[in-house]
């Protein structure tokens, strides 16, 4: 950490407190960790990931949050309104130390134009999902979810493995950068198009990507060689997906699977139109935002049309939750929704059991603390073969960014067991300092997003946004350390509402009680949400877990 007002930020390490308690300290360190140069995409602009997803509204607001957290008593709660600390209230020790609301707008005004106008006026910020809720852990944060998605794809279409299969995708930013490693962990070959060569180089540095090949034909030739030999391999190709995907289709090249994780959710701040360098795009964005959006959407239409073309030629094609289809339709491509989103295609059965992205970070900064938690997870869930494979591969292949952290998908009935075991390890000194447990907002009961997590719900409840609000209220009542409700993450303003919660594992008896309640109730609501929507798998899970649903089965 530095004392400068806009310079490098790094979370404190070790066991010495700079706040009045570990719940406040956990929030402070994770906020700072979000802006660690090893973690954030553009830390000097407070941008963590996802196009323009920020940790705080301004540097002035950031330092005011830091000051407020350091002065916060153990029976007080800090309120953060879209990245700005607005008040501290006396509450009680079990209350969250921080409550956050990011990017929320009244529905009639919930569009990018209005949001940007308010953002320019200094009244709001875009929090994405884990940027503004202070629990981003770098590309690993999405890695296991991406691994699970490609594993489900392999099971459904390719006999349980991606060996000998080529997957084409685009986008190697903070989220999309997980794709090459997730594909190779499933034994496949990844062709990854990225418009910003610096991102390719960063993924190479972090060992998420194996090779960079600038020539398209040479990249395809190398991918086909790896396919024939059954060699897991990932290749980064500099280029614009709106140009490269159609070019591959015109060549008659058909990969086995195609998806995309460019920043299509934001046609102004994220996606780069075809025909522009990064510098030219930045100039156009500033000079003529309206034209920029039109050109970006036209490019997305071509990009999406190529994906439909691959599908028609036999490729398995799916949307990876960035709203490319929605923006492509606005760009004039009427058949944009011809292929499904990844949640209805592969992930919903896991959501029915409350399974989702369970993550934790070592506040000590000591990688040995994460090694101890890895062993604990392996001991707790030896029967979960996919989880065991993930932990073993992650230990070997995943480089920590910022504070050491781990993610794995656990469900209702499992998360609290892991949390309680971690608490025992902190209490006994095996883990040297408290850890923070949190999750992505992409979870089974914490999001309403009709183009992603709640696409195609059985009862038609895709757009019902009560569930993420109930999730935040439930986690607040259960004793979470900090809780956040956001708007627009993943798919853009006007298209999602979602919530997140974190709990500090401090080795105390009170900590154990908080952990058990938060990590039982949070995923259980995901089971309830899907049971209420009519999924029999979720109803069976609710009965097995003893969840009390007054109208279950009626």
From Swiss-Prot:
Signal peptide: none
Reaction(s) this enzyme catalyzes, per UniProt: 4-imidazolone-5-propanoate = trans-urocanate + H2O
The record's free-text note on cofactor binding: Binds 1 NAD(+) per subunit.
Subcellular location: Cytoplasm
InterPro entries reported for this sequence: Urocanase, Urocanase-like, Urocanase_C, Urocanase_central_sf, Urocanase_CS, Urocanase_N, Urocanase_Rossmann-like, Urocanase_sf
Group of enzyme by EC: lyase
Superkingdom of the source species: Bacteria
One MF annotation (Gene Ontology) recorded for this entry: urocanate hydratase activity
Pathway as given in its UniProt record: Amino-acid degradation; L-histidine degradation into L-glutamate; N-formimidoyl-L-glutamate from L-histidine: step 2/3
Binding residue positions for NAD(+): 50-51, 128, 174-176, 194, 199, 240-241, 261-265, 271-272, 320, 490
EC number(s) reported in the record: 4.2.1.49
Entry annotation: catalytic residues: 408
GO cellular component, one term: cytoplasm
NCBIfam families: hutU, PRK05414.1
Functional summary from the UniProt entry: Catalyzes the conversion of urocanate to 4-imidazolone-5-propionate.
Annotated family: Belongs to the urocanase family.
Protein's name according to its UniProt entry: Urocanate hydratase
Protein source organism: Rubrobacter xylanophilus (strain DSM 9941 / JCM 11954 / NBRC 16129 / PRD-1)
Taxonomy of the source species: Bacteria, Bacillati, Actinomycetota, Rubrobacteria, Rubrobacterales
Gene name for this UniProt entry: hutU
